[in-house]
Regions:
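Bacterial N-terminal signal peptides
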Residues: 2-13
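ATP-dependent phospho-/nucleotidyl transfer catalytic cores
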Residues: 492
């Protein structure tokens, strides 16, 4: 679907309606951001992104909650609350995840309405809208709601959502604040709302149970909302009972209805401070971040903050689509992990313990199984503080719960996905010289979990680990997903070995490095695939490499119980830590190359297909690195060819511009890194040298150094690399270390329309 607003000019276009949208200066980088990218596409394989307002890595993600008429939102169409194919808005809630397959949160929905309403009206207050009167960019969102003649505008700080509603009707203008709102499929408890008409304020709280938060007892939040306009009258509701003038209400369905009277030609602004610690903290967050500021001031500050973040990578290209895709991808990579620390340093930790973050910002919503592959490696270059915050937060979570979490969401462990991906994140951070954390403590948590065999232990984060340690693989009899689990454990063991070595624990390093070779135990030399294996050492039959599996999705396609979210073909390449060992298993390097190229050719012809097939699937994580394996096989030219194909074919400028769920910026960061010509070997301190799609780039490394990338003769046809130099010296192999890049310098690619001998190396 083509977007109406493309944001190629300096100003956001005006929306006609009750009040003209102010001309908003977007600045040099935010003007290229299009938050609608990844909000549409086919159900379930959408990017699952939202177009609303947020600050970089902020707590508040203020965005419309949409649906079809009658509130229909089937098939996980909009897990972040918004789906581009919907045509009604139910209101604007303040919390959500970004790009995940899980519907989560949706705290404190605000909905503008007009005229008189019954309780039944409140439950069906959907507002039609069209995309030709909707616009968004980094830090700002607006939509015209014709049924109530209202222009809704949103912006945000780290902990505060700021709204402005401009009405062009003589009907009473009203604002509903639902204290117990949640996104689709959730529920709420412990709701409370209180109105203070003297100070134009509403406060409240609720515990929300949704996709992830419902797995650990719900996430209780608090809000203080302050208006700039007095109420003409007000009511509160408890379920279907609406009581005029009642100041306080309680229950699992409660909120406030605020009547401002005739606001024709006028606007009402409100600021909503959020905290997950206390009501007092919500108020302190509100006052600290927005005291004395109106909507325009907050919006301008949000846009400026985004421009500062986006300017950390300056690119040059004459292709406007590339610039749009690049800066939107960089924007989407800077939404999670979430700032969970209030302005006074307090945060709600695991088991609802209130902690204090000293010397760092406690962050949550870490989609580690995904983000360790691309997003966090990007942070080690341009967002070092965010990377260290993430590590320190994981250690704090482990201290509270007994183990490093797998997928922390809000104030608890969601348990989503599998393995111990925090091992990769922590090891890579330390190996790249970011050592300002308690590495010994982190290592002990990593080691304990890797050796834990008691399923009842808090450290039991590896399913079937007892069998893994006993057999050197996970027998099929132990349970489902045995192949995928074993491959991930081997990768994670290798990262533990690298950290052990860096810490001088050489016996441990040798042990885990040897165990990281366990992937070989499930490789069938006859079929040349990783397969489920029985306790007696025989491979399970029948076997087909083309069957695709989904266990945690609502639309199962096929069942092949040894694999997670993919086919045996897609898991065939999952030996990120030992690509040469993988190639040796194939027995012949040329055979490996031909199989890998056929795998790429068998990708679905269309981006974001509902059935990804068994070939290359850029919309999921386990084969994201596959195109770079051509480099390990001695064919950098094929890597260069297929990198350009992924960059141009699997990304676009429309609402369907991603090949699947973005998962906390994972697909977005893949684009950012590959577009400038490098790709991380996750869990290590090394990068592949790829082939850039931009003419040049400057990366601000945050340590006083600048990494410059230049692509000489860059064009749509010149996709191959004939030579690469770093600081004037020709590179003789297509790899580079983090230490070299992080010291700054210039990486120069000479591009060519034809493959070079040895891929330019």
């Amino acid at each position: 679907t083509a977007l109406i607003f493309l944001f190629m000019s300096v100003f956001v276009p005006n929306i006609t309606g009750p009040a003209q949208m102010p001309e908003v200066e977007m600045g040099e980088y935010a003007r290229y951001v299009d938050p609608f990218i990844g909000t549409g596409g086919l159900p379930w394989v959408s990017g699952m992104l939202f177009p609303g307002a947020t600050a970089p890595f902020g707590l508040v993600r203020l965005s419309p909650d949409t649906a079809f008429p009658a509130g229909l939102n089937p098939f996980k169409m909009g897990t972040a609350g918004y789906y581009y194919g919907h045509n009604t808005i139910w209101g604007f809630s303040h919390t959500r995840l970004s790009g995940t397959g899980a519907v989560d949160m949706g705290h404190f929905r605000v909905t503008p309405v007009t005229g008189k309403m019954s309780a039944a009206d409140r439950l069906s207050s959907s507002l039609p809208f069209s995309h030709d009167k909707e616009t968004a960019t980094a830090g700002y969102y607006a939509v015209y709601l014709p049924s109530i003649s209202c222009l809704a505008e949103l912006t945000a700080t780290q902990h505060v959502g700021v709204h402005r509603y401009s009405f062009d009707t003589s009907k009473d203008a009203r604002i509903l604040i639902d204290a117990t709102s949640f996104l689709a499929g959730g529920r709420a408890e412990e709701g409370r709302v209180k109105v203070n008409p003297e100070t134009y304020e509403v406060e409240g709280e609720a515990r929300v149970f949704t996709g992830f938060t419902g797995r650990y007892g719900g996430l209780k939040g608090y809000f203080v909302a302050k208006f700039d306009t007095p109420f003409k009258s007000f009511a509160t509701w408890e379920g279907s009972a609406v009581t005029e003038g009642k100041i306080e209400a309680f229950g699992n369905d409660t909120g406030a209805d605020l009547n401002f009277g005739n606001l024709k030609g006028k606007s009402v602004e409100l600021k909503v401070g959020i905290s997950f610690v206390s009501l007092e903290n919500a108020r302190e967050n509100l006052e600290f971040e927005t005291e004395g500021k109106n909507f325009d001031t907050v919006r301008d500050e949000a846009v400026a903050e985004w421009n500062a973040g986006l300017s950390k990578i300056k690119i040059d290209t004459n292709d406007k689509d590339i610039k749009k895709i690049f800066y939107t991808a960089l924007y989407h990579s800077m939404i999670m992990p979430t700032n969970f620390t209030d302005v006074n340093g307090q945060y709600l930790g695991f088991n609802e313990k209130v902690g204090v973050a000293e010397g760092y910002t406690y962050r949550t919503d870490l989609s580690l199984w995904d983000t360790v592959r691309t997003t966090h490696p990007l942070y080690t270059l341009i967002e070092k503080e965010i990377q260290l915050d993430s590590v320190k937060s994981l250690i704090a979570m482990a201290e509270e719960s007994g183990a490093l979490p797998r997928w922390p969401s809000g104030a608890g462990e969601s348990g989503s996905m599998f393995g111990t991906p925090a091992d990769l994140l922590i090891a890579e951070t330390y190996l790249k010289g970011l050592t300002d954390f308690d590495a010994e403590k982190a290592y002990n948590f990593m080691k304990n979990t890797a050796l834990e065999t008691d399923d009842d232990s808090p450290a039991a984060k590896r399913d079937y680990n007892k069998e893994y340690l006993q057999y050197g693989y996970i027998p099929a009899q132990a349970g489902k997903r045995s192949v995928s689990y074993a491959l991930e454990y081997a990768w994670e063991d290798y990262s533990i070995a690298l950290l052990a070595e860096a810490l001088g624990k050489f016996e441990d390093a040798e042990f885990f490095k040897e165990r990281s070779k366990s992937y070989k135990n499930i490789f069938n030399p006859e079929t040349k695939y990783f397969q489920a294996k029985s306790k007696n050492g025989t491979f399970v039959e029948p076997f087909s490499p083309y069957i695709t599996t989904y266990y945690d999705e609502v639309l199962p396609i096929k069942v092949s119980s040894a694999y997670v979210e993919g086919s045996p073909r897609q898991w065939r390449w999952s030996v990120q830590h030992d690509p040469q060992g993988l190639i040796e298993l194939f027995g012949d390097r040329d055979y490996f190359i031909s199989e890998l190229e056929q795998f790429m050719k068998d990708a679905t012809p269309k981006r974001a297909a509902i059935d990804p097939g068994s070939g290359y699937w850029h919309g999921n994580q386990h084969d994201l690195h596959a195109v770079y394996l051509f480099i390990d096989a001695g064919r950098p030219d094929l890597a260069q060819k297929w990198i350009r194909w992924v960059l141009t074919d699997r990304y676009g400028t429309g609402a369907d511009g991603l090949d699947g769920n973005d998962d906390g910026g994972t697909l977005s960061a893949w684009y950012v890194l590959s577009a400038v010509g490098i790709y991380p070997m996750a869990g290590t301190d090394k990068y592949y040298i790829g082939a850039p799609i931009v003419d040049s780039a400057e990366l601000d490394l945050g340590n006083g150094n600048i990494l410059k990338v230049r692509a000489v003769n860059q064009s749509k046809d010149n996709i191959y690399v004939s030579e690469v130099t770093f600081n004037g010296e020709k590179l003789t192999e297509p790899y580079i270390t983090h230490a070299l890049l992080d010291a700054g310098g210039e990486l120069v690619f000479t591009m060519s329309p034809t493959p070079a001998e040895n891929g330019g190396f």
